[in-house]
């Protein structure tokens, strides 16, 4: 069985890491390079950077952040936020990213997934899906969870895989930032229909929440932010807990 991955998420705004609830009420969480280096030392399996300002000016700042981080950190880096073209992807991959994440642009231009996979390999292309529960299903929202698309999240994930996505980064808007656990029904519904890894996101408040997402939610990896940023738990503590519960994880010596 493949190791389950623990992935800190760093939302970057104006060159600083921030954290909010359901994409609003942002507060400062520190310097991206310092935090990335700390998480690398603690045993993170990968890092995800999301540029939540994503103006043209900020994209340059983000590329600079990625370049600095890639000199300090030797685990895979995935970078997303406002990527709209192959040129945007190229900029970040050249700066040192290993993977790029596309969200709103993939919904408006699904062929971007195929073009990215063709140019860089599907292992490089992560499709991020922000989903909100509506009755017995989940709708895809774009533009930082503000814009309903009418797309069913499970169907969109399946289509993204067909188009060439190498992974799905699945965020529950309902759970995001609330620290009360992941939407494991959503994780299971999506994961059971795909042959590519699903990264569960939104809702981590304790090591048990991460365990439940990997076990009950059947996710391949878990993304978490505030649980790590504010020092509530270290990555090493969380991974030791997951190991003690019988999950396969990579532990630092």
Swiss-Prot record:
<dbReference type="GO" id="GO:0000107">
    <property type="term" value="F:imidazoleglycerol-phosphate synthase activity"/>
</dbReference>
<dbReference type="InterPro" id="IPR050064">
    <property type="entry name" value="IGPS_HisA/HisF"/>
</dbReference>
<dbReference type="InterPro" id="IPR004651">
    <property type="entry name" value="HisF"/>
</dbReference>
<keyword id="KW-0028">Amino-acid biosynthesis</keyword>
<comment type="similarity">
    <text>Belongs to the HisA/HisF family.</text>
</comment>
<keyword id="KW-0963">Cytoplasm</keyword>
<keyword id="KW-0456">Lyase</keyword>
<dbReference type="GO" id="GO:0016829">
    <property type="term" value="F:lyase activity"/>
</dbReference>
<dbReference type="InterPro" id="IPR013785">
    <property type="entry name" value="Aldolase_TIM"/>
</dbReference>
<protein>
    <recommendedName>
        <fullName>Imidazole glycerol phosphate synthase subunit HisF</fullName>
        <ecNumber>4.3.2.10</ecNumber>
    </recommendedName>
</protein>
<comment type="pathway">
    <text>Amino-acid biosynthesis; L-histidine biosynthesis; L-histidine from 5-phospho-alpha-D-ribose 1-diphosphate: step 5/9.</text>
</comment>
<comment type="function">
    <text>IGPS catalyzes the conversion of PRFAR and glutamine to IGP, AICAR and glutamate. The HisF subunit catalyzes the cyclization activity that produces IGP and AICAR from PRFAR using the ammonia provided by the HisH subunit.</text>
</comment>
<feature type="active site">
    <location>
        <position position="11"/>
    </location>
</feature>
<dbReference type="InterPro" id="IPR011060">
    <property type="entry name" value="RibuloseP-bd_barrel"/>
</dbReference>
<feature type="active site">
    <location>
        <position position="130"/>
    </location>
</feature>
<dbReference type="Pfam" id="PF00977">
    <property type="entry name" value="His_biosynth"/>
</dbReference>
<dbReference type="GO" id="GO:0005737">
    <property type="term" value="C:cytoplasm"/>
</dbReference>
<comment type="subunit">
    <text>Heterodimer of HisH and HisF.</text>
</comment>
<dbReference type="GO" id="GO:0000105">
    <property type="term" value="P:L-histidine biosynthetic process"/>
</dbReference>
<keyword id="KW-0368">Histidine biosynthesis</keyword>
<dbReference type="InterPro" id="IPR006062">
    <property type="entry name" value="His_biosynth"/>
</dbReference>
């Amino acid at each position: 069985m493949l190791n389950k991955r623990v992935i800190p998420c760093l939302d970057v705004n104006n060159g600083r890491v921030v954290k909010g609830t359901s994409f609003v009420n942002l507060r400062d969480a520190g310097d991206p390079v310092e935090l990335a280096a700390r998480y690398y030392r603690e045993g993170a399996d990968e890092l995800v950077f999301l540029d939540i300002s994503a103006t043209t000016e900020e994209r340059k700042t983000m590329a600079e952040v990625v370049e600095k981080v890639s000199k300090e950190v030797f685990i895979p880096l995935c970078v997303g936020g406002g990527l709209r073209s192959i040129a945007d992807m190229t900029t970040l991959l050249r700066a040192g990213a290993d993977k790029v994440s596309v969200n709103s642009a993939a919904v408006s231009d699904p062929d971007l997934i195929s073009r990215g996979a063709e140019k860089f390999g599907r292992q490089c292309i992560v499709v991020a899906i922000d989903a909100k529960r509506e009755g017995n299903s989940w709708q895809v929202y774009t533009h930082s969870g503000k814009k309903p698309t009418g797309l069913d999240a499970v169907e969109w994930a399946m289509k993204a895989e067909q188009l060439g996505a190498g992974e799905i980064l699945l965020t529950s808007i309902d759970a995001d930032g609330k620290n009360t656990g992941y939407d494991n029904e959503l994780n299971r519904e999506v994961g059971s229909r795909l042959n590519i890894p699903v990264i569960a996101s939104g809702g981590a408040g304790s090591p048990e929440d991460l365990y439940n997402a990997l076990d009950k939610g059947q996710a391949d990896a878990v993304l978490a932010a505030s649980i790590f940023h504010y020092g509530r738990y270290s990555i090493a503590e969380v991974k030791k807990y997951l190991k003690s519960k019988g999950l396969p994880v990579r532990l630092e010596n």
